[in-house]
Amino acid sequence: MAELTSMKLNAESHLLLDQPLLRMPYELSRRNFKNAQRVIEHSSANMTTSLAAATKAASKSASPDATLDSLDAMISKMQVLKRKLEGLHEEETRIHKSAKARLRHLQDLYDVNSLVDVKYDEWSRTRLSRLLVDYLLREGYSESAAHLAQSKEIEDLVDVDAFIACHKIERSLREGMSTSLALDWCKEHSKELKKGGSMLEFELRLQQYIELVRQGGETKLVEARVHAKKYLSTSGDFELLRKAAGLLAYKPWDDVEPYVSLYSPSRWAHLANLFLSTHHNLYSLPPRPLLHIALSAGLSALKTPACHSAYTSSSANASSATTSVCPICSTELNELARNVPYAHHTKSIVKNDPVVLPNGRIYGRDQLTAFNKKVGTESGWVRDPVDGIKGEAWSESEVRKVYIM
């Protein structure tokens, strides 16, 4: 159809927003593989030691009971290893299932030829559900996100469990004022954090030092000095070390910078935000919700100077013909798009002899005539190509010519 040629789908440009969709399974699979490798290496070393001890005991004509005890200990260790590997295998299977579903979801877009195809509408609704789940997870509404993912049957396309674990650690910092969970996470990802030059673990150790000094007392101050020597002295940041040492001479209620800032409870919020940014960087997740990115791009692409003009905006004139046509002029989006920049248009493309239908849509007259002739619209009447043959028909006298100033 003639009207579909101008609505051809470019799958590559659509998938720019969906790059993180495959990064998370990849990072999870890589981490799971390293965990399995670590478990096997550790267990192999233990098994080798146990086997050598059992062989040595048997060669010295040890009692049968002692030999059996050694063998039972080895079997127990092997059973523990088996359970750990089975758990890691189940996790790997789940990750592969999720990755396969995501690849299938992205491949579905390449099977769509036009923006007006019903399949594209279905695919877009699935993506919108994904973006909403991502937004809810980032805002901490994990239960609502899980229910939405389940109702839309997109559990394999979203990372509910990963975000739940992330926010558990974040809340332990922001609300619980505890560094234990975050330090466990740092230990689990120590190689990646060290490679990326992350300061998260150092900041957490510094907070532990601050809390020891805050408690006061000779015992706690001695613990603080030992802690600083063990965890802080290797940082190489002598300016920060100088400030940390200065805490020993000041109390939490002393209004002296920079020590009052180090003692401030707001540092816990700083640590929580630092953990979130570190977590998202590690798993190649964008710092902002994907819904924000999609909305910003969409609002910018549709926004025109007329949308917020005091003279021409339909938001200021309820009787405007564009009120139900322009999304930016709608009551819901007009104020939201006020500070969004205009799209950068390098060229304008206008069909020859443009005309506007009563519903506000503009087409070239030749394109409109060709479509209505092809679908067999009654002479003297026209239909909107987007609505198709089931759409409303208007008299040609209602079609107005468009003039571009």
Curated annotation (Swiss-Prot):
InterPro entries, per database record: CRA_dom (IPR013144), CTLH/CRA (IPR024964), CTLH_C (IPR006595), Fyv10_fam (IPR045098), LisH (IPR006594), ZF_RING_GID (IPR044063)
Residue pairs linked by disulfide bridges in the UniProt entry: none
One GO CC annotation: cytoplasm
Superkingdom classification of source: Eukaryota
Domain LisH intervals: 124-156
UniProt zinc finger (RING-Gid-type) residues: 326-387
GO molecular function: ubiquitin protein ligase activity; zinc ion binding
Keywords attached to this entry: Cytoplasm, Metal-binding, Nucleus, Zinc, Zinc-finger
CTLH domain residues: 162-220
Pfam family, one: CTLH
Location relative to the cell: Cytoplasm; Nucleus
Record-level GO BP terms: negative regulation of gluconeogenesis; proteasome-mediated ubiquitin-dependent protein catabolic process
Primary location group: cytoplasm
Family statement drawn from the similarity comment of this UniProt entry: Belongs to the FYV10 family.
Entries under PANTHER family matching the protein: E3 UBIQUITIN-PROTEIN TRANSFERASE MAEA (PTHR12170:SF2), MACROPHAGE ERYTHROBLAST ATTACHER-RELATED (PTHR12170)
Functional summary from the UniProt entry: Involved in the proteasome-dependent degradation of fructose-1,6-bisphosphatase.
Protein name: Protein FYV10
Protein source organism: Phaeosphaeria nodorum (strain SN15 / ATCC MYA-4574 / FGSC 10173)
Annotated gene: FYV10
